[in-house]
Swiss-Prot record:
Its main location: endoplasmic reticulum. Residues 62-72 are extracellular. The chain crosses the membrane at residues 41-61. Belongs to the SecE/SEC61-gamma family. It is a single-pass membrane protein. This is Probable protein transport protein Sec61 subunit gamma. GO terms for cellular component: endoplasmic reticulum membrane.
Length: 72
């Protein structure tokens, strides 16, 4: 019986600690947030372009390696 009573208190204590932690956290300003979003977007775009370029280069190389000269 006492274990059943402790579970909700554990959960409420955990939620209370989460609320206290989130209140103590320093949140970024709007300018910092927009700058961070722009940098992440540029990084993701760069990785996409890099992946596309690597794929574009390796497809012809793979076709040259895989294809045999006797087949037509």
């Amino acid at each position: 019986m006492s274990q059943k009573l402790q579970k909700p208190s554990f959960l409420s204590e955990y939620l209370r600690s989460i609320r206290l932690f989130s209140k103590k956290c320093v949140r970024p300003s709007g300018k910092e947030l927009s700058m961070s979003i722009k940098r992440h977007a540029i990084g993701i775009g760069f990785l996409g372009i890099l992946g596309y370029a690597i794929k574009l280069i390796h497809i012809p190389i793979n076709n040259i390696i895989v294809s045999s000269p006797g087949k037509e």
